A protein has these predicted regions:
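Basic amphipathic alpha-helical segments that dock to polyanions
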Residues: 45-52
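Beta-hairpin "wing" of winged helix-turn-helix
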Residues: 53-70, 75
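N-terminal helix-turn-helix DNA-binding core of bacterial DNA-binding proteins
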Residues: 2-44
């Protein structure tokens, strides 16, 4: 699936706001929170993680996953928390504008 620029970053930051996670855990959380609608290909996920780490929004360290395998764990930095706040406001405004253009109302579906 193609995502608008910045979408992957804000989804990763939001996921990491709940605590550190490895790449597979981040991808799984996004898929589960979106009820299977959104998924990240490995290449897109790891490109975003490297980009965000170079910007200082996240940091990483090696550790052991739940199944005792070596994995790189990512966590959000204070700069990442600030960026998440900025991006959340921006996405909220964007989503509201698109809903208005499409003459839609947000309703949770059963």
């Amino acid at each position: 699936m193609n995502y608008l620029q910045g979408t992957v970053d804000v989804m990763i930051l939001k996921t990491l706001s709940g605590g550190p996670s490895h790449g597979f855990g981040i991808s799984k959380a996004i898929r589960e929170r979106s009820e299977g609608v959104l998924g990240l290909e490995d290449a897109a996920l790891y490109q975003a993680l490297h980009r965000m780490e170079s910007k200082g929004w996240i940091e990483s360290e090696w550790g052991l996953s739940e199944n005792n395998r070596r994995a790189k764990f990512y966590q959000m930095t204070p700069d990442g928390e600030r960026q998440l706040s900025i991006e959340t406001v921006s996405w909220h405004r964007y989503a509201l504008a698109v809903f208005k253009v499409l003459d839609l109302r947000f309703e949770a579906r059963p």
